[in-house]
Amino acid sequence: MFSISRITRTSSFTTQFRALYRFKHSARKLQSIPFSIYKKMSAADRLNQTHDILSESVQAVENPFKVTVIGSGNWGTTISKVVAENAALRPHLFVKRVDMWVFEETVDGQKLTEIINTKHQNVKYLPNIDLPENLVANPDLVSAVKDADILVFNIPHQFLPRIVSQLQGNIKKDARAISCLKGFDVSKDGVKLLSTYVTEKLGITCGALSGANLAPEVAKENWSETTVAYELPKDFKGEGKDVDHAVLKALFHRPYFHVNVIDDVAGISVAGALKNVVALGCGFVEGLGWGNNASAAIQRVGLGEIIKFGQMFFPDSRVETYYQESAGVADLITTCSGGRNVRVATHMAKTGKSAEECEKELLNGQSAQVFTHVRRSTSGWPSAVRPMNSFCSRPFTRLSTRTLLWTLCQT
């Protein structure tokens, strides 16, 4: 539920005032429910009631926002489900139809988009999860984004340059975006956030979403929380006319998926990218049978390295984000406990196979988000490991798994 403590972490006095007003308004409505009725409600019913009241407190906009999700993997489809549910419930804020761009594939002789639009399930990447009927799978990227006011990027980050190049000149000039991608744009000029890359290439303001969000659990509507970071642009049109924190909360918040909106885009982006390197170490620990104590040490050292990295390359990022937000330590714990990176690293340690081989065996066509290239050495262990969407203070070159873990633990 919305709390006073979280109001203090918003970006401006005006935002704080509005958040406090909405909180008081919602509290009054909750108090109006007779206790005899409230005590009979299940926990899920209470979450739904609170969710509905909070959403009603968001001011209607002049023109409802059209939302498009770019990406349809397991996480992309899950976020599309969340967004489409909210779009259907809030016609005063969003256009009911939500487009989800799908890279067209054939599954059992039928186009994946046709399956999604008729059976309302993504049978390849998110099977056995029912999707809202107002979620439309669209294989034409330009068609999917042309009228969108809010773009939600949720694709493997290595495809971002190609996608962005196709979007140039084909989106609204005043569109806003949220990136669910994990990683950095690294060049000779330095390190950039992927949200910054989107802003520079498309000329639109882009925030980020990250948190302790294993896609299958969110899709099954197990209770989860996440963090959305968005800094209001200089050309902000005003409340009711443009995307702000309240609109983003209404877009992503569900009774089973609680959202906190802040403005530290760098903080949650750094945490979301570098957690995967730490998860790699935890997977090797598990595969070698070193136990939970060693895994905890990897996570402790890893969190410290993440914070140092953030302070070095993005000095405006806030240390408290790593500790207080779902995108920080909570996401690190979740990813190191059961994410795809842990599974791949564990399998590598147990079998001596390359990352590519393990990905093919375990991930149904998806990537582990950690490697770009792994060469097999004569001993069977990776002879060159280069992080794909994040990196550490030391190169992973010609290291056995045990040496790699030792390197991770040195500070």
Swiss-Prot record:
The keyword NAD applies. Keywords: NAD, Oxidoreductase. It comes from the Eukaryota. Substrate binds at K182, R340, N341. Its EC number is 1.1.1.8. One of its GO terms (cellular component) is cytosol. It catalyses: sn-glycerol 3-phosphate + NAD(+) = dihydroxyacetone phosphate + NADH + H(+). NAD(+) binds at G71, S72, G73, N74, W75, G76, F103, F159, A215, R340, Q369. The active site is at K275. One of its GO terms (molecular function) is glycerol-3-phosphate dehydrogenase (NAD+) activity. One of its GO terms (biological process) is glycerol-3-phosphate catabolic process. It holds the Pfam family NAD_Gly3P_dh_C. Belongs to the NAD-dependent glycerol-3-phosphate dehydrogenase family. PANTHER family: GLYCEROL-3-PHOSPHATE DEHYDROGENASE (PTHR11728), GLYCEROL-3-PHOSPHATE DEHYDROGENASE [NAD(+)]-RELATED (PTHR11728:SF8). NCBIfam families: glycerol3P_DH. This is Glycerol-3-phosphate dehydrogenase [NAD(+)]. It comes from Lachancea thermotolerans (Yeast). The lineage of its organism: Eukaryota, Fungi, Dikarya, Ascomycota, Saccharomycotina. The gene is GPD.
